[in-house]
C-alpha cells in the first residue's frame, strides 16, 4: 500500500534512485496505490549526469510492494521493497532496463513494454 509521502526505490535505469509519492492517479478517493497503479512522484535521489534530476516531478507505475497481493487463485505475492518504474505521459518507460522481478498483473494493465524489459515476471 503506497500512500502520499511514501518513499520508493526505482526499478529501472532512468537516472532516478529514490522517489516519494505525492499523488495517486485515478479516482479522487484513492487512498492507497497498489501494483499497477500510476502515481505522481518527486525524485528524492538521482544518479549524477543523467537526464532526470533531483526534485523533478514525474509519473511512475508501481511494480513491487511490501503489502501482499492476493490473486484470484488464492496465491499471495509479497516483495521485499516498494519499487516503481518511471514512465512518460503515454505510459512508456523512460529507462531501457528494468531491474528485479515484477508482477504478472502489469501485462493485464497494458504495461507490456515494462513486462518485456523485466528479467523475471512472477
UniProtKB/Swiss-Prot annotation:
Highest taxon above the source species: Eukaryota
SMART domains referenced in this protein's UniProt entry, alphabetically: Ribosomal_L14 (SM01374)
One term under GO cellular component: cytosolic large ribosomal subunit
Record-level GO BP terms: translation
Assigned keywords, A-Z: Chloroplast, Plastid, Ribonucleoprotein, Ribosomal protein, RNA-binding, rRNA-binding
Recorded GO MF terms: large ribosomal subunit rRNA binding; structural constituent of ribosome
InterPro entries the UniProt entry points to: Ribosomal_uL14 (IPR000218), Ribosomal_uL14_bac-type (IPR005745), Ribosomal_uL14_CS (IPR019972), Ribosomal_uL14_sf (IPR036853)
Signal peptide: none
Pfam families referenced in this protein's UniProt entry, alphabetically: Ribosomal_L14
Subcellular location: Plastid, Chloroplast
Annotated family: Belongs to the universal ribosomal protein uL14 family.
Functional note: Binds to 23S rRNA.
UniProt xrefs under PANTHER family: 50S/60S RIBOSOMAL PROTEIN L14/L23, LARGE RIBOSOMAL SUBUNIT PROTEIN UL14M
Subunit structure: Part of the 50S ribosomal subunit.
Name the UniProt record assigns to this protein: Large ribosomal subunit protein uL14c
Originating gene: rpl14
Amino acid at each position: 500500500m503506497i500512500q502520499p509521502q511514501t518513499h520508493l526505490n526505482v526499478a529501472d535505469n532512468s537516472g532516478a534512485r529514490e522517489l516519494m509519492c505525492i499523488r495517486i492517479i485515478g479516482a479522487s478517493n484513492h487512498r492507497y496505490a497498489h501494483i499497477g497503479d500510476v502515481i505522481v512522484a518527486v525524485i528524492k535521489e538521482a544518479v549524477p549526469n543523467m537526464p532526470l534530476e533531483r526534485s523533478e516531478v514525474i509519473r511512475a507505475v508501481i511494480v513491487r510492494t511490501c503489502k501482499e497481493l492476493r490473486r484470484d487463485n488464492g496465491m499471495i505475492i509479497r516483495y521485499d521493497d516498494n519499487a516503481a518504474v518511471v514512465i512518460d505521459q503515454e505510459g512508456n518507460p523512460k529507462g531501457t532496463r528494468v531491474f528485479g522481478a515484477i508482477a504478472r498483473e502489469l501485462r493485464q494493465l497494458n504495461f507490456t513494454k515494462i513486462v518485456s524489459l523485466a528479467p523475471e515476471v512472477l
